[in-house]
């Protein structure tokens, strides 16, 4: 760093009075005082900023190298430094040389001794024009930190901590932001034994339907039915051709435990809304994931439409396409005549009829009911819903201005969109494990939806994870949960002990694959003493229907199944559900154990867990809000009497598997 003093000519009088020697001595004294003041300030700032570095520098000074700036070699003329003949540029200084002693006077117009080399006649960087006689303090202050005085005060450089020093801290949990209809549902009571509502308390139900209910032994509604039936009847209060007040009714979503009466909650209002129809058209369409469940729902519709002119058609692929076409449409001289008011179908078969059945029309569709909605959403890759919606809003003659009830796609509610009334399409979603993920529900295109949910499901909204499945499922009140720690080899022995020693008459056992189900069936059959059957896709629809009927009648004691029967199948009298293979997902467990403790009855669920599965499974159920699981340990002494017959059955199982492989190869 070089401090300089610009000697300006003060005038002839002042120069004559002071003389050349006095002026030069005064300039040197002022420059020295300014330099000392800047050096002291630099030391104070350095000590305030890095007190620890100065101590570390003193201790590590011999081991560290001092950084020095690269020096430039400059050509020095023979003229003395400080004389008017000296060249422009910086002067080299010896190490440890005092800057104040070497600061010298420069001529006006020459660059300062601490600045970079510039063209002759240009002002030095960082300085500004000043009045004659004033010192360029701003330029000196800017140049001060770069000089040797600051280097001496700073001392040697000490390496510091660049990365690290971060403490472990748990990330805050982000609360999901849900739409209002999901965050504030219509809460439904979940106790189906104490919160019953008498039939007379809902007078809007048609007297003929009330008579049908009493004839089948129903004198009270379950809480879900008491909440959903009035809401659906209100949306069809002005008839099924137009919505209430001419507006499109809201879509409904119902999330309630298994066995809480969801099927009857939509059967009663749909049948009542269509009682006034004159011409037969497809007004209600029920879409379900499995053939067995579709057959069960079709049976309920047939019961309550028996004394009415309404007709129900089942379309699941159990019959040939031609047979199903005969139950849907009839060809006449004037065209095609519809033969069904209510159609119960599976997605794949429904799309087949939309594409291949002449005269099959959904243009008069009023109710679209999606049961087991969470599984139906997972099968949206089949694109069945867009096909149904496109068929429902397809117009025969879009250019006809006289079509008063011409169906159009739903738009924003404006004066123009409501001036011409049209028959609305109302969507109804039902499931025990209805997802609350807005991204998935958006695929359904719901219109101003309303959610009916149990209190437990509403509580779980705050604990919804990325899939939208955690902490929001409700279990039947009368269900008792158990888990049995065991090894992989002792699993069949545990199942045999539960069936033979504990005296359960109807046991439903679930496995994760069709192969595991078949092998366990062969093993129990070889063991003997148990009426066992297998329920899987190995059998056709007729055989599966016969097996379920025998199981309900008590002719089959143990039914080994895959998850095919875990979805909505209402099997009467199931006392015990055994999870032979622990379910991987929460909603799979909910549907499995929901086959027992239905309609207010009691039931038990046992899950066989390996040691590596216990922690994850228990945490999953705890987050779901399930009641406390009871640990049920079986000692080797209890299973020892079954071991001899079990070993014989294993040898027979091996032979049976070999024979089946030979048959497949042949």
Curated annotation (Swiss-Prot):
- Main location, first listed in the record: nucleus
Checking PROSITE patterns in the record gives:
DEAD_ATP_HELICASE (PS00039), HELICASE_ATP_BIND_1 (PS51192), HELICASE_CTER (PS51194)
| Acidic residues: bias regions | 97-108
Q: Where in this protein would one find the motif DEAD box, according to its record?
A: 371-374
What Pfam families does its record include? DEAD (PF00270), Helicase_C (PF00271)
Q: Ranges of Low complexity compositional bias?
A: 10-28, 49-58
Keyword Chaperone listed? The answer is: no
- Residues bearing PTM Phosphoserine: 83, 103
The record lists ATP as bound by 256-263
Catalytic activity, EC: 3.6.4.13
Which GO BP terms sit in this record?
Answer: rRNA processing
Which ranges belong to the motif Q motif? 221-229
Record's compositionally biased regions (Basic residues): 65-75
SUPFAM superfamilies attached to this UniProt entry: P-loop containing nucleoside triphosphate hydrolases
Q: Which enzyme class?
A: hydrolase
What does the domain comment read?
Answer: The Q motif is unique to and characteristic of the DEAD box family of RNA helicases and controls ATP binding and hydrolysis.
Q: Which Gene3D superfamilies match?
A: P-loop containing nucleotide triphosphate hydrolases (3.40.50.300)
Q: What is this protein called?
A: ATP-dependent RNA helicase DDX51
Family, per the entry? Belongs to the DEAD box helicase family. DDX51/DBP6 subfamily.
* Segments of this protein annotated with the region Disordered: 9-152
Using the chain's own numbering, where are the disulfide bonds?
Answer: none
Specify the Helicase ATP-binding domain's residue ranges. 243-452
